[in-house]
A protein has these predicted regions:
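Compositionally biased, intrinsically disordered or flexible polar/acidic segments
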Residues: 6-163
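GH16 jelly-roll
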Residues: 162-410
Length: 410
């Protein structure tokens, strides 16, 4: 059960504690209550702002802040790993370099030199999210100043795992094997020619010409311009590949990564993502989806990370971020990752975070459903509503090379 006044769930299996810089409980846009932080905060002073904070539907969680050297001692029900989500915004007009602080958890620096203005700009929601191993009944957090005074609007803490173990890899595929061989049995090919509501041009096959190991430690998913009629009788103008780990590898929460070299070319749409195990048929989007990396060939320097879920009326929503690299991502291998925790998904490129989709920021009516097991998907689509159609410059073949995929948990 949940106490609306306290903002704390009492069920240890799904325990959460939500605290905000306020003298009274606050309700976010999704209807969840956040308790005043006085019971857990030490130091700092409450500062109120009327700044219009962008990037969130719950600006009150960012407008009121605790500023100054501050620490938190948060009681937790059991030893284990906890997700810590700090809700931050620069509402005081500080310029880059004028408010810089370290975030420590359990005495260890977990996020050094946080400068919210430099990260996202002024009056915009930002998040520092870490997974913390707690071995006793209290989670210790500290915001330690480097320049100026730290400022935090709210703290969200959630139990991830009651197993008191450090982050460790539970799945690691380096795609070793001879050229032309099928990938590990964890990856199962999906076949057929009706995808993307009929807007995509490819038929997915299990042929080695579309999906196989390359003999050099890579998985190759290759799209080919060719007429192909599949068993269902549909004829498509391209073939390609889609692999899923459903029924073989599923997980709830973790850090998922892939090192990939993506293709360029108008109309090509490589993606690495996670799909809810119950997503078949009409159950999408209710089962949830995390797009770790989506790229389109005509914009090869940009990568997008998104989450998808249902609205209160049953339609789908998408929320995410885009990162533009200094040069084309098709020129070499890059690591695309997502840190999935109970109330957030943080996307990164080559180890640098570029955006967090957070439950606290969703508008009313957008449901957060990312609390059930998901499995991995790798695919290379052609065309569709987002990628657009190939054109005269599009090469007739394109290959998504995957060097490694990993899943880490606690």
């Amino acid at each position: 059960m949940q106490s609306a006044a306290l903002g704390v769930t009492a069920n240890a299996a799904t325990w959460q504690g939500r605290y905000c810089a306020s003298t009274a409980a606050v309700r976010d846009a999704g209807g969840r209550m956040w308790a005043p932080d006085a019971a857990v905060a030490r130091g700092g002073q409450l500062v109120r702002s009327s700044a219009a904070v962008a990037g969130t539907s719950s600006p009150v969680l960012y407008q009121n802040q605790r500023q100054g050297p501050v620490s938190f001692a948060i009681p937790v029900p059991t030893a284990g790993t906890y997700a810590v989500d700090l809700l931050l915004a620069e509402t005081g007009g500080a310029q880059p370099g004028q408010r810089v602080f370290d975030v420590l958890a359990e005495g260890t620096v977990r996020a050094p030199s946080i400068d919210v203005e430099a990260r996202v700009g002024g009056a915009r929601a930002d998040h520092v999210v870490v997974a913390v191993l707690v071995t006793d009944g209290r989670l210790e957090l500290q915001l330690r100043p480097r320049v100026g005074v730290p400022a935090v609007g709210a703290v969200d803490v959630a139990l991830v795992s009651s197993t008191a173990t450090a982050e460790h890899t539970v799945f690691d595929d380096t795609f070793a094997g001879p050229a032309g061989a099928a990938p590990d049995a964890a990856w199962q090919p999906q076949t057929g020619g009706r995808w993307g509501g009929g807007a995509e041009l490819q038929a997915y096959t299990a042929r080695a010409s579309n999906v196989s190991l390359d003999g050099s430690g890579h998985l190759a998913l290759t799209a080919r311009r060719e007429s192909y009629t599949g068993p269902e009788g549909a004829t498509n103008s391209y073939t390609s590949a889609r692999l899923e780990t459903g029924g073989r590898l599923s997980f709830r929460y973790g850090r998922v990564s892939a090192s990939m070299r993506v293709p360029a070319g108008a109309g090509y749409w490589p993606a690495f993502w996670a799909l809810g195990d119950a997503a078949g048929g009409a159950q999408w989007p209710s089962a949830g989806e995390i797009d770790v990396a989506e790229l389109i060939g005509q914009r090869p320097a940009a990568v997008d990370g998104h989450v998808h879920g249902p609205t209160a009326t049953g339609t789908a929503y998408g929320s995410g971020y885009e990162r533009t690299a200094p040069s084309s991502l098709a020129l070499g291998f890059h690591t695309y990752s997502a840190l999935w925790l109970p109330d957030s998904v943080t996307f990164s490129l080559d180890g640098k975070d570029y955006g967090t989709v957070d439950r606290a920021d969703l508008p009313a009516g957008q449901r957060w459903v990312l609390d059930q097991p998901e499995h991995l998907v790798l695919n290379l689509a052609v065309g569709g509503s987002w990628a657009g159609a190939p054109d005269a410059s599009t090469p007739p073949t394109a290959t998504l090379l995957v060097d490694r995929t990993t899943v880490a948990r606690w």
